[in-house]
């Protein structure tokens, strides 16, 4: 009889411990959802990245947040985890950065290069697509196969489609500036020099 009571007490203790852990997790998730509601780091429809998961927020419940990833997978992240991890909210960006090197060929002259830099800088500064105070355009490098112009600006459009449309238009307009100044984009190339001239062979018909 005494052994049976001991077993019953042991079972109750294990059950109580399991319930305590379950309650702890549940309370942590409820607290996490409360933090999300109060702090508002994101809302339904936002594009976020947190704890290795990136996608669009579809639903926020007391237990978890549902995120639709770009491969269209549905990931449920516990709110307790989200409330204690860094969150990147891409939707809340006010502007987006464009940065690239524009490589032109080595036969570009000093005057051409100077004009290119000035024209691109003036174009971007006056463009409605970007913030004028963020524009940087400089002749920067003598690279292996190109003379590099360093270009940086921030677009006013922060959503993906708007950003890509702005970047496309900027690329097309810079291409036109290159054409107007008689310059060409460079590509990797190799020059081979022979110490002695190669003999040319001809076939007699």
In which residue ranges do the predicted regions lie?
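Hydrophobic alpha-helical transmembrane segments and their immediate juxtamembrane helical boundaries
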Residues: 1-25, 31, 35
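Soluble accessory domains appended to multi-pass membrane transport proteins
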Residues: 35-131
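Solvent-exposed, non-transmembrane regulatory segments of membrane-associated proteins
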Residues: 88-90, 96-99, 104-205
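Residue-level signal for pocket-adjacent positions within structured domains
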Residues: 3, 72, 77, 82-85, ...
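Short, structured secondary-structure boundary patches
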Residues: 27-30, 80, 201-205
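Transmembrane helix-bundle signature of multi-pass membrane transporters/permeases
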Residues: 13, 52-55, 141
């Amino acid at each position: 009889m005494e052994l049976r009571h001991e077993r019953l007490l042991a079972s109750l203790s294990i059950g109580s411990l399991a319930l305590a852990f379950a309650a702890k997790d549940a309370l942590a998730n409820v607290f996490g959802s409360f933090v999300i509601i109060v702090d508002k780091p994101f809302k339904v429809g936002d594009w976020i990245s947190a704890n290795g998961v990136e996608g669009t927020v579809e639903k926020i419940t007391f237990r978890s947040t549902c995120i639709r990833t770009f491969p269209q997978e549905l990931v449920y992240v516990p709110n307790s985890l989200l409330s204690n991890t860094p969150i990147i909210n891409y939707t809340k960006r006010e502007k987006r950065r464009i940065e690239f090197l524009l490589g032109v060929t080595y036969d570009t002259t000093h005057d051409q290069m100077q004009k290119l830099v000035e024209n691109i800088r003036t174009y971007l500064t006056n463009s409605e697509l970007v913030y004028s105070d963020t524009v940087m355009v400089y002749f920067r490098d003598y690279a292996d196969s190109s003379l590099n112009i360093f270009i940086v600006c921030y677009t006013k459009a922060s959503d993906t489609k708007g950003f890509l449309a702005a970047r496309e238009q900027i690329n097309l307009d810079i291409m036109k500036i290159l054409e107007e100044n008689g310059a060409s984009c460079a590509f990797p190339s190799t020059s081979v020099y022979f110490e002695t001239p190669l003999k040319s062979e001809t076939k007699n018909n």
